[in-house]
A protein has these predicted regions:
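Extended, well-ordered protein cores
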Residues: 1, 7, 18-29, 39, ...
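Extended, Lys/Arg-enriched charged tracts that mediate electrostatic binding to polyanionic substrates
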Residues: 1-12, 135
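A generic hydrophobic-helix recognition signal that picks specific residues
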Residues: 13-16, 146
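Generic beta-strand/beta-sheet core signal
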Residues: 14, 28-30, 159
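Extended, charged helical/alpha-beta scaffold domains that provide interaction surfaces
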Residues: 17-18, 153
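Extended active-site and interfacial segments that coordinate phosphate-rich ligands
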Residues: 27-53
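Extended, charge-enriched "interface" segments that sit outside catalytic cores
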Residues: 56-174
Length: 174
């Protein structure tokens, strides 16, 4: 059979957990923030695991000039190139955990903040592998991870925030 296009993204997930303010006094902005952070914490943990798997697998030396320029004369350019992304996942995971458990302040600028932060370096790796006749490798775990990142983003699911309509009317009337 014919494979799916590389940029294929059939679904995106959404949730209302932590965002259902439609008459529920227990769902506050604090609850919404915690739900979003827990989702990002879980996503970062899962992406970190997948990136570690790629780093272990990608020991080849042949790479694109773009990766070579970014990694210097490394004998393992893909590993060197992917480590900062994996480390950002690890940092995001641990920082959110410290915030939730110990109320340690978060520096949002250092956290993973968009799915493009995941996809851009993965695209560079994929292009390099394809350029160097490694299409089978590029179409394996790497492509799976790219599809997951497109589907789940940095929070695993988009949050649908529902607000009781009289609050909107009150705000508009003010």
């Amino acid at each position: 059979g014919k494979g799916l296009p590389k940029n294929f993204n059939p679904i995106e997930f959404g949730s209302w957990m932590g965002g259902d303010r439609d008459g529920n006094p227990n769902v506050t902005s604090k609850v919404t923030k915690e739900v979003l952070l827990l989702s990002r914490w879980e996503a970062a943990k899962l992406y970190e695991k997948e990136l570690t798997k790629l780093i272990r697998s990608y020991s080849m030396r042949k790479c694109s000039k773009k990766i070579q320029k970014l990694t210097g004369k490394s004998f393992e350019p893909y590993r060197v190139f992917l480590r900062p992304l994996r480390d950002k996942m690890r940092f995001t995971h641990r920082a959110i955990e410290q915030f939730i458990v110990n109320k340690k302040p978060l520096d949002y600028k250092k956290l993973l903040n968009s799915k493009e932060e995941i996809l851009k370096p993965l695209r560079i790796v994929r292009e390099s592998l394809e350029e160097n006749q490694s299409e089978n490798i590029a179409s394996g775990d790497l492509l799976d991870l790219m599809r997951r990142a497109k589907c789940f983003g940095i929070n695993l699911a988009k949050l649908d925030i529902r607000q009781e309509s009289s609050r909107h009317s009150q705000l508009i009337n003010e």
